[in-house]
Amino acid sequence: MKSHKFSSGPAVTGQCLCGSVQFEMEYPAFWAWHDHSRASRLAHGAVYATYVGTWRKRFRITAGDREISRFEEKETGAVRSFCRCCGTPLVYERTRSPYMINIPRALFQSRTGRQPIYHIAIEDMQDWAYAGEPLSPLKGYPGVFCRRSKRKSRV
């Protein structure tokens, strides 16, 4: 953890892929969860997004504020912020929680004080998502794994 102090605790730091935008959040986070919604899937380009949520007053941009681009979802009014240099999703703000801010967990450089134990929009989870099936190394491709094929029983 970085040595900066907020009113009640130390800060954890994070940044976008290119490092243009940097931020800090007071430790610990309020909650963490996996979001399987279509909107988060499209915003992140991934099967789901993992967020850390905290009070807005416990989060601050420390560098690169001018590099942040914002997008408002017309249906929900939610605002998603991205680094305009590298495209990294930075912040997700929901209209029904105006005092809270949600940050992708992967952007933090250390522990946030919360493990993602919640799942939202589970009904939107894709059938092609990895669900913990056993994996085997792919022959000839070091570091690549694949689902084990189910053997058909011979009659």
Predicted segment positions?
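A short Gly-Trp-Pro
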Residues: 1-15, 20-155
